[in-house]
């Protein structure tokens, strides 16, 4: 009798594949308008960026993705600011051309969707009916002027420069993000473990294309492709 493939075991939702959300800080979105003071800088599990613990005059606590150069007891402002400084959160319409911003909202009020990884930022290019930004990928994208963003670069730019050195350290890092530390090809498995497994040499042994309505356990390979991928051309 065959065994469940990895996709089926992941869908079952066991602890091996489930993200340890009890260790995470939750969704980090923009707080309400006001003046906040940085109370602490936290190294959050599951993230490659530090997180700021901020508090306002009403003693309301919020979390914010840290910017480069942040320090404890620093004041930051959130709202409609005419001349924003590094670390302030305001509308794209108020941020001058040539500025770098991060944690950019896709639509006004969603809390930030773009440029949230360590060391990244987008460049404000021009203003008009929409604000044009150059993203880290090199793509120019237009945003609504009422979308908010944080001025500056995200901290932790050297996160990827530090060598991991030990396999165990890498496994623990990936486990904090609920990712598998390795990938095994289907053709390298036994026939009992995968539809592509088995045989005297590594080969699929059947058409690798599968339809959209294929049942779980057989739905492996190229899913409903528009055309066949040709190698060596």
Swiss-Prot record:
- Ranges annotated as biased composition (Basic residues): 219-233
Q: What is this protein called?
A: Large ribosomal subunit protein uL2
Which portions of the sequence form the region Disordered?
A: 194-233
- Entry coiled-coil feature ranges: none
Subunit and interaction comment: Part of the 50S ribosomal subunit. Forms a bridge to the 30S subunit in the 70S ribosome.
Transmembrane region positions? none
- Give the species: Picrophilus torridus (strain ATCC 700027 / DSM 9790 / JCM 10055 / NBRC 100828 / KAW 2/3)
Alphabetized, the UniProt keywords read: Ribonucleoprotein, Ribosomal protein, RNA-binding, rRNA-binding
The protein's job, in short, is: One of the primary rRNA binding proteins. Required for association of the 30S and 50S subunits to form the 70S ribosome, for tRNA binding and peptide bond formation. It has been suggested to have peptidyltransferase activity; this is somewhat controversial. Makes several contacts with the 16S rRNA in the 70S ribosome.
The record's listing under SMART domains reads:
Ribosomal_L2, Ribosomal_L2_C
**A biological process (GO) annotation for this entry?**
cytoplasmic translation
PANTHER family per UniProt? LARGE RIBOSOMAL SUBUNIT PROTEIN UL2 (PTHR13691:SF16), RIBOSOMAL PROTEIN L2 (PTHR13691)
Output the NCBIfam families linked to this UniProt entry: PRK09612.1
Q: Which family does it belong to?
A: Belongs to the universal ribosomal protein uL2 family.
Q: Which domain of life is it from?
A: Archaea
HAMAP family in UniProt: Ribosomal_uL2_A
A single Gene Ontology CC annotation of this entry is: cytosolic large ribosomal subunit
Which GO MF terms does the UniProt record name?
Answer: rRNA binding; structural constituent of ribosome
């Amino acid at each position: 009798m065959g065994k469940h493939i990895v996709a089926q075991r992941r869908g079952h939702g066991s602890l091996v594949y489930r993200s340890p959300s009890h260790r995470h800080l939750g969704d980090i979105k923009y707080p309400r308008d006001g003046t906040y003071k940085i109370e602490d800088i936290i190294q959050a599990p599951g993230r490659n960026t530090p997180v700021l613990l901020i508090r306002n005059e009403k003693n309301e606590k919020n979390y914010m993705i840290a910017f480069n150069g942040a320090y404890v007891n620093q004041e930051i402002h959130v709202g409609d600011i005419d001349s924003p400084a590094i670390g302030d959160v305001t509308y794209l319409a108020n941020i001058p051309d040539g500025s770098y911003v991060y944690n950019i909202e896709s639509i006004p009020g969603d809390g930030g969707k773009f440029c949230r990884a360590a060391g990244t930022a987008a460049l404000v290019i021009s203003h008009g009916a929409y604000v044009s930004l150059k993203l880290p990928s090199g793509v120019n994208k237009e945003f609504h002027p009422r979308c908010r963003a944080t001025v500056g670069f995200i901290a932790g730019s050297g996160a990827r420069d530090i060598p991991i050195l030990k396999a165990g350290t890498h496994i623990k890092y990936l486990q904090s993000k609920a990712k598998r530390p390795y990938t095994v090809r289907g053709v390298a498995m036994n026939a009992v473990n995968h539809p592509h497994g088995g045989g005297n040499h590594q080969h699929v042994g059947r058409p690798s294309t599968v339809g959209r309505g294929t049942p779980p356990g057989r739905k492996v390979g190229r899913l409903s492709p528009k055309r066949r991928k040709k190698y060596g051309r």
